[in-house]
């Protein structure tokens, strides 16, 4: 099928507008950006139903074609069903295929065999996450290899991810493009009152409550002493989850568990007015929550690993266990000048590396290379003029 210029299909997310994680937010930003620059953009959207009545339908949202795919399956099987139906439908439509994540990469060879151009964001190293049982980790491991070899072009959102992918494909096949963010220069303090909080009198963690995000380490470290400040742990807790119960049991009376908050204005206010942001992620690349903390000017206390060191730069105090985390928290709560320096460094780092426009332009250059009449081989594809990402 001959591909016209400036036509893109985005798959791998639940759809737009964004109601879930970082990939959905990126898909919305990128689709709107391209639509405003004359591209024909379609985004696949998952529609969960009890009974399939209309397998595929489309509408137009803010200049973007949304392709709704119905699935009656639940959980992981529903996601796979959706991924397969997206691939099958994409065979009937022109355009470069931008795939966000590799969880359903087993179906990508169908696109390549049909001569389609595939550009895949490889996300984090999902198969390393301890929360997954062995069969699921094996599935992700195999899919990572399939995506790496099926896609003409790979994107890593962090240099360490690009290094990892170089064990699967030639390094020339991968371009580094991180996640983006927007400056937060003000936010109302009103949302804090409902949680019993005062500006600059608390620190905040915003993450899924999972072992590889070190939530238990953070809660134990904060609760090791009387702080005179509060720790806000934002995330969904489940009553039947043993790890969640352990986190709650470790908390002092200065720890607040508001649950999951999906109102972006409230989350933005919680970040902006926090004395520091605690980030325990250990697996993945450029984490959206950490980028957003930098844009909010947060002093950062982060787990010491290559992902967080590169992303936060000089804006972070680093920890690797309960003791070092407790020491970093105590330092951030006691030293006003240090917090000011870290806050300034956070904004400088965000402006230098994580502007949305830089990110979106870099993605567009890659898609243009793939959409060109003869296509771009990995070694020929355009590199972003941003050496700080390499």
Description of each model-found segment:
Residues 147-175, 181-183, 363:
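A short, active-site helix/loop in glycosyltransferases that binds the activated sugar's phosphate group
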Residues 282:
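Aromatic "clamp/platform" in nucleotide-sugar-dependent glycosyltransferases that forms part
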Residues 244-265:
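Nucleotide-activated donor-binding/catalytic signature segment of Leloir-type glycosyltransferases, i.e.
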Residues 9-10, 194-226, 232:
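Conserved donor-binding/catalytic core segment of Leloir-type glycosyltransferases
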Residues 91, 137-154:
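Membrane-proximal helix-turn-helix segments that form the acceptor-binding/catalytic region
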Residues 78-123, 127, 285:
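An aromatic- and histidine-rich active-site surface loop
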């Amino acid at each position: 099928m001959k591909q016209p210029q400036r036509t893109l299909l985005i798959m791998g997310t639940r759809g737009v507008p964004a109601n879930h994680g970082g990939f959905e937010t990126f898909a919305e930003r990128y689709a709107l950006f391209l639509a405003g620059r004359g591209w024909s953009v379609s985004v696949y959207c998952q529609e969960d139903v009890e009974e399939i009545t209309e397998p595929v339908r489309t509408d137009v949202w803010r200049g973007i074609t949304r392709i709704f795919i119905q699935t009656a399956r639940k959980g992981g099987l529903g996601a796979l069903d959706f991924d397969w139906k997206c691939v099958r439908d994409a065979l009937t439509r022109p355009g470069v295929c931008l795939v966000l994540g590799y969880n359903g990469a087993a179906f990508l060879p169908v696109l390549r065999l049909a001569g389609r151009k595939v550009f895949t964001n490889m996300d984090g190293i999902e198969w390393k996450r301890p929360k997954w049982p062995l069969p699921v980790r094996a599935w992700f491991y195999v899919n990572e290899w399939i995506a790496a070899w099926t896609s003409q072009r790979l994107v890593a959102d962090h240099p360490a991810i690009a290094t990892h992918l170089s064990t699967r494909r030639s390094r020339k096949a991968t371009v580094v493009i991180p996640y983006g963010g927007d400056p937060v220069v003000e936010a109302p303090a009103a949302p804090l009152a409902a949680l019993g909080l005062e500006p600059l009198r608390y620190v905040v963690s915003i993450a899924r409550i999972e072992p590889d995000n070190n939530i238990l380490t953070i809660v134990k470290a904060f609760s090791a002493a009387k702080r005179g400040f509060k720790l806000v742990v934002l995330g969904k807790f489940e009553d039947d989850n043993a790890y969640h119960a352990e986190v709650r049991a470790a908390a002092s009376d200065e720890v607040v568990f508001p649950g999951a908050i999906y109102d972006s204005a409230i989350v933005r206010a919680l970040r902006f007015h926090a004395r520091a942001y605690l980030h325990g992620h250990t697996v993945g690349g450029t984490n959206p929550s950490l980028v957003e903390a930098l844009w909010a000017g947060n002093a950062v206390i982060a787990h010491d690993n290559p992902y967080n060191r590169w992303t936060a730069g000089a804006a972070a105090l680093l920890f690797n266990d309960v003791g070092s985390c407790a020491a970093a928290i105590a330092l951030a709560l006691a030293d006003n000048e240090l917090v000011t320096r870290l806050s300034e460094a956070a904004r400088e780092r965000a402006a230098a590396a994580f502007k949305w426009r830089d990110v979106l332009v870099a993605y567009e250059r890659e898609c243009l290379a793939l959409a060109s009449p003869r296509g771009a081989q990995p070694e020929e594809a355009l590199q972003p003029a941003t050496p700080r990402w390499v």
